[in-house]
Each structure stands twice: as C-alpha cells, then as structure tokens.
C-alpha cells in the first residue's frame, strides 16, 4: 500500500514538472539549431574541392572527386 502511494505521488510530481516545462517553452526556442533555420546548406560545386569537367579522375568508376557524377578516365 505504501509503495502504491509513493508511485502515485511520483507520477503526479513528474506530470506537474512536464506541464511546467511545457508552459515555459511556449515562447519558442531561444537558440534553435542551425540546421532547422537553413544555415547549414550543402556546399555548391564551386565551394568544394572537386575535379572539373574533362580532367583526369581515374578508370571506370563513380568518382566522388568529380564535380559531375560520371567518371570514365575523365570527369563527364
């Protein structure tokens, strides 16, 4: 019986804490993550280090180093 009362009180306290936290956060985030604001964008092809079109990249494989997705001795 005592254990049941302790568990009920603990659940009520935790529920009250959740409601208090939810009410305090209604004003919005003070410091939102950069990814949610769009500040973290993928670098464009000119900003990243890549092999330009018509330059040697290797033999018969998909090269991540090419600015274009196709590599057959040279980047296409």
From Swiss-Prot:
Compartment list: Secreted
GO molecular function: ion channel inhibitor activity; toxin activity
Organism, scientific name: Californiconus californicus
Residue numbers spanned by region Disordered: 25-44
Organism domain of life: Eukaryota
Signal peptide: 1-22
Cellular component annotations (GO), alphabetically ordered: extracellular region
Annotated S-S bridges: 50-67, 57-71, 66-75
Protein name, entry field: Conotoxin Cl6.2
Propeptide residues according to the Swiss-Prot or TrEMBL record: 23-47
Domain notes per entry: The presence of a 'disulfide through disulfide knot' structurally defines this protein as a knottin. The cysteine framework is VI/VII (C-C-CC-C-C).
């Amino acid at each position: 019986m005592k254990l049941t009362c302790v568990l009920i009180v603990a659940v009520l306290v935790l529920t009250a804490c959740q409601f208090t936290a939810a009410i305090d956060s209604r004003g919005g985030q003070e410091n939102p993550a950069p990814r949610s604001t769009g500040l973290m964008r993928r670098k464009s092809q000119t900003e990243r280090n890549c092999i330009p079109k018509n330059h040697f990249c290797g033999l018969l494989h998909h090269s991540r180093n090419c600015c274009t997705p196709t590599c057959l001795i040279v980047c296409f």
